[in-house]
Amino acid sequence: MYAVVVRGQAQDGKMEDLKNFIKNEAIPSLEVEGMISIGFCNPEENVNLGMVFLTDKEAADRFGEARNENIAKLQDILAGPPNVQEGEITLGKIYQEVTAEEREGDFVRVVFAKVGDAETAENFVKEKIFPIYNEAEGLRAAGFMVVDGEAISWNFWDSEEAANVVVPKFNEELSSAEEIFNEAPVAYMGTIYAGKNFIDITKGME
């Protein structure tokens, strides 16, 4: 499975315009062959974070063409070109079955961290973070990849409250593994304001 993460910055006062564009124009036009799921949140003022899951790189390339067409329409809304990172998901698991439908309201945490060695970072997440996921209540899905020296991990929850129960456990593990990271991990958190699952997502899917 392949993931694309898009971080965009809206101009001051234009965040609602960006949200409306994504809801009403972008998502309907971004469906391409191989698309599994898409979602957007607003984790910080004027920051828009999108996550897209696809079957493979070929699907991601098709999505990239559609994405660029949409970005071209946003010159008066975005503060600059979005940051786009994409790659093969190396760790991932679905904890709840989800049907193909439009989705809003999920709470998502996406953590970015510069790392010196991708394999060491992956082993840490596999051995220390995924056991926390496996015991968590209200977790919908989680995954991990490294793109150009930056580790990206994500988890989707029923609610912010469910996520907050386990965040201290994440932080405890992260604080004991500072040597893995070139700089402190940065977490983006927010509620999905626009999203869609294009297929039924099965529990246990990896």
Model-based region annotation:
Residues 1-49, 53-72, 76-206:
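Short S/T/G/P-rich N-terminal loop/turn motif that feeds into the first structured element of a domain
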